A protein has these predicted regions:
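Structural motif
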Residues: 6, 33, 60, 109-110, ...
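Active-site-proximal beta-strand elements of phosphoester/diester hydrolases
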Residues: 5-13, 108-115, 173-177
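Short loop/helix-cap segments at secondary-structure boundaries that form the rim of catalytic
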Residues: 53-54, 102, 164-169
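Core catalytic region of metal-dependent phosphoesterases/phosphodiesterases
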Residues: 4-94
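His/acidic metal-ligating clusters that form di-metal
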Residues: 29-30, 88-164
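Active-site environment of divalent metal-dependent phosphoester hydrolases
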Residues: 13-18, 42-45, 66-72, 117-119, ...
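Acidic, His/Gly-rich catalytic cores of divalent-metal-dependent hydrolytic chemistry
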Residues: 165-204
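Flexible, charged surface loops at secondary-structure boundaries
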Residues: 1, 56, 146-150
């Protein structure tokens, strides 16, 4: 059996107790690979610990808008965060890619924090279908994969509310919700588990 289980987490926002709770659940689920879709920092108090934890526990980390904003802007109003995170971790955040793509059981999946065009764009579930389909284009943001193709499945974070949308031609758009700061009126961490044959280009 070549089926892999991939956990996708996002939007921890310095909430270490929530991150530890999610990883307790991940351990129970025999996960093979862990991907984090960014926003490690901001809002919560434990940004430094969250960065260190995700850096060593996740197989892939992509940047979020908070990670990019805090590490690039270096504004005085963010001094509290910047002093606690420290320059070495800020440099780590600056170097994170913006997207990752891979094949799973014949479907090409691409994951990023917020949008295929810009980490600061927002994609809400009530937007028009034309806007949603833009998420499947070859990203204009930096990426870890070299696949010059549109995606079959897209997963993202940013809006702190999990949903799944089945679109035309078998396309699937999903949001993983938030580990540390949910906005969906459910005061619990959420994350996604994908199952399939990792790296398999043929449909299984």
């Amino acid at each position: 059996d070549n089926v892999s289980k991939i956990a996708i987490i996002s939007d921890i926002h310095g909430n270490m107790p929530a991150l530890e709770a999610v990883f307790d659940d991940i351990r129970k689920n025999d996960i093979d690979k862990i991907i984090c879709l960014g926003d490690l920092v901001g809002k919560g108090p434990s940004c430094k610990r969250v960065i260190d934890f995700c850096r060593y526990k996740c197989d892939v980390v992509v940047t979020g808008n908070w990670d990019k904003f805090l590490s690039h802007k270096m504004e005085e109003r963010n001094r509290w965060y910047l002093d606690r995170i420290g320059e070495e971790r800020l440099q780590y955040l600056r170097e994170l890619p913006e997207s990752v793509g891979f094949y799973l059981s014949g479907r090409f999946i691409r994951l990023f924090h917020a949008h295929s065009e810009d980490v600061y764009l927002r994609m809400y579930p009530n937007l028009e279908i034309e806007e949603k389909l833009k998420m499947f284009n070859i990203p204009k943001i930096s990426r870890l994969d070299n696949e010059e193709r549109k995606s079959d499945i897209v997963g993202y974070g940013d809006i702190h509310g999990a949903f799944i949308d089945y679109l035309e031609d078998g396309k699937i758009l999903f949001n993983v919700g938030s580990v540390g700061c949910p906005y969906d009126n459910i005061p619990m961490a959420s994350y996604v588990i994908l199952e399939g044959e990792y790296g398999m280009k043929e449909q299984s």
